[in-house]
A protein has these predicted regions:
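Aromatic, loop-rich ligand-recognition surfaces of beta-strand-rich domains
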Residues: 450-513, 518-559
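Inter-helical turn/loop segments and adjacent helix faces that build the functional surface
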Residues: 28-40, 109-124, 251-259
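Aromatic-rich carbohydrate-recognition surfaces in CAZymes
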Residues: 1-75, 81-83, 95-103, 170, ...
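Active-site acid/base region of carbohydrate-active enzymes
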Residues: 31-97, 124-131, 137-150, 192-220, ...
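Catalytic cores of carbohydrate-active enzymes
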Residues: 54-66, 101-190, 204-205, 264-303, ...
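Predominantly extracellular/luminal regions of secreted and cell-surface proteins
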Residues: 416-450
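Solvent-exposed loop and edge beta-strand segments that line ligand/cofactor-binding
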Residues: 5-18, 84-101, 150-177, 220-241, ...
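Non-catalytic C-terminal accessory modules of carbohydrate-active enzymes
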Residues: 230, 247-418, 423
Length: 559
């Protein structure tokens, strides 16, 4: 809800980058069945769709975009449009990506409009959907390359010609399958052989974004000081790998013409992708997904401080809808089709279980146990709804069962009375040291993370002396619990060795909570007390070894 509201009501969708947000709203509806939530922003969704007309070529009937604004700088179209000298900006192109996104968004708007009873809008966007499909198939499919490709949209460019197709395959050519835009025909399915070809898009450690025989494959153009910056002329990108694996899952799930790819290929590529999520070895092995990777070594390319904070994997969705095979539907049916190869295949799995998955207001579990020995629940594939088994088959394959929709569980949204939405207004923070306004504000800004590269929170001065942080609400409020978050790095910052919470009651400070021991480092410490009414609260802290204290967030609630 928060993300959708931000994109459609909070001003978050300025169309700076291409997106398939409307399709995501429909996809969310398929999972939770919440009709009201799905339709809440329909007028705004339609308005934003129409704003994309500025990137629509009314002669060619296709959308175009500068690759940078497709979040894919340094593509074939942008590099070639620069004469091979750059590629960060420029290179506008009719791309499989933006046209697939707009196809999916139009289809979602048609379905949502029909659900809302607006048949005219439903017909309008259904027609738009099919028009885009027709032009993508007619104009972006290359018989020569057997792949969906870009066409240049740049006019008056000395290096490329308007409407000319690009000269090499790119991974983006698989995105039409992500949204079932592609017909179930053998001529299109043959495109998937390039994903398996080491001389094309298949790297030893991941999917190349451009095939290896491109003239400027892996040429590094952009640097931040001595460090290479992000480019899409060959490196593996988790964001697009996710998209391609969703498309491949669609192909394997409900297409008859599969071309050369198999479920074994899917699992191998999924395992390959899984490996990119880890860095280090042995006891030092850790989850750490970065921006992009070298397709032959699997090592990060950019590796800047920001790189560890890219949230573009989509990995959970691949596991639940692909490997486990939960295929969300609008009706009261649960459909499961795990994309596992048969026993004996090197990529086969003998067992898995996905549990407590929310679906149409229920909690479902899907279990696969090839011989029944792992879970002791019987052999085969089974589905449970709210803890009760409702369907089973002895072998891998498609399994469906009726699931009566229920009201989704209410989301608990307690109000943090301490958050300072506007600097300088109540509630106001104050502190014993390091009283820079931004430093003080950071402890009550509502944001919570523990990343050393992105400091957030009030940081005290390093000192053995006691420290305090106080909040003035400007009026009496009722409080009954707190959540405290402290950062520790084993270096300059440590959690306090002692702490207590006080409130202004009857004109003086009175202790309302004195926990034992130290608070949690890089996590949440919960405090409770009998509800009190006060206008001021302060946290008293005793530093550990004279180290600084970073109070990442100080939250206070009524109950």
């Amino acid at each position: 809800d928060d993300y959708i509201d931000f994109m459609y009501a909070g001003g978050g969708n300025d169309r700076h980058f291409t997106d398939y947000m409307a399709d995501s709203v429909w996809g969310r509806y398929l999972v939770d069945g919440d009709r009201e939530a799905a339709l809440r922003h329909l007028p705004v969704m339609r308005h934003i769709y129409r704003l994309w007309d500025e990137k629509f070529d009314f002669d060619k009937r296709l959308y175009f975009v500068e690759p940078l604004l497709d979040a894919t700088e340094y593509t074939v179209s942008s590099i070639d449009a620069s004469g091979g000298k750059d590629g960060f900006r420029g290179g506008d192109a009719f791309r499989p990506s933006i046209n697939s996104y707009m196809f999916a968004n139009a289809r979602a708007l048609s379905r949502l409009a029909a659900m809302a009873g607006d048949e005219a809008m439903a017909r309008d966007y259904a027609a738009r959907t099919e028009a885009i499909r027709g032009h993508v198939l007619a104009d972006l499919w290359s018989e020569k390359l057997t792949h969906f490709i870009d066409r240049h949209q740049s006019r008056k460019n000395p290096h490329v010609t308007y409407w000319e197709p690009i000269r090499n395959r790119e991974l983006v050519g698989y995105l039409p399958w992500m949204f079932d835009l592609v017909p179930d025909e053998a001529r299109y399915a043959q495109a998937w052989r390039h994903l398996l070809d080491l001389a094309s898009l298949a790297g030893k450690a991941g999917m190349r974004t451009v095939e290896v025989n491109y003239e400027y494959y892996m040429r590094q153009y952009r640097y931040l000081g001595p460090d290479p910056e992000c480019q899409w002329n060959g490196p593996v990108w988790p964001y697009q790998t996710t998209q391609v694996l969703i498309g491949l899952a669609n192909l394997l799930d409900h297409y008859q013409s599969l071309g050369p790819v198999t479920r074994s290929d899917y699992m191998r590529l999924l395992r390959q992708y899984t490996a990119l999520h880890y860095q280090g070895a042995g006891k030092a092995k850790r989850l750490d997904l970065e921006e992009d990777y070298h397709p032959e070594t699997g090592q990060p390319i950019v590796g800047l401080e920001r790189s560890h904070h890219y949230f573009h994997s989509g990995y959970n969705d691949l596991i639940l809808t692909g490997l486990v095979g939960i295929r969300p539907r609008a009706d009261d049916v649960l459909e499961v089709n795990p994309l596992l190869p048969e026993a004996g295949d090197p990529q086969a799995l003998a067992w898995f279980r996905a549990q407590d998955v929310p679906y149409h207001g229920r909690r479902i579990a899907v279990t696969w146990d090839a011989d029944g020995s792992h879970y002791g629940r019987g052999k085969g594939l089974s589905i449970e709804v709210d803890g009760r088994e409702v369907a089973r088959r002895p072998t891998l394959g498609r399994l469906t069962t009726a699931v009566e929709s229920a009201r989704n569980a209410t989301i608990d949204r307690p109000i943090n009375r301490a958050v300072q939405l506007v600097r300088g207004q109540f509630p106001k923070g104050s502190a014993s040291s390091n009283t820079d306004p931004e430093n003080v504000h950071d402890a009550i800004d509502g944001r919570l993370w523990f990343f050393p590269e992105l400091p957030n929170g009030w940081s005290s001065a390093p000192s053995p002396a006691g420290q305090w942080y106080a909040i003035d609400f400007g009026k009496p409020v009722v409080l009954g619990r707190a959540e405290l978050a402290f950062f520790a790095d084993g270096k300059g910052f440590a959690v306090p060795r002692g702490y207590r919470l006080q409130a202004m009651i009857g004109g003086g400070w009175k202790t309302i909570a004195t926990p034992r021991g130290s608070p949690v480092a890089d996590g949440i410490t919960f405090l409770r007390w009998p509800a009190i009414r006060t206008d001021k609260v302060r946290l008293l802290m005793t530093p550990k070894g004279g180290k600084a204290i970073r109070l990442v967030e100080f939250k206070l609630f009524q109950d």
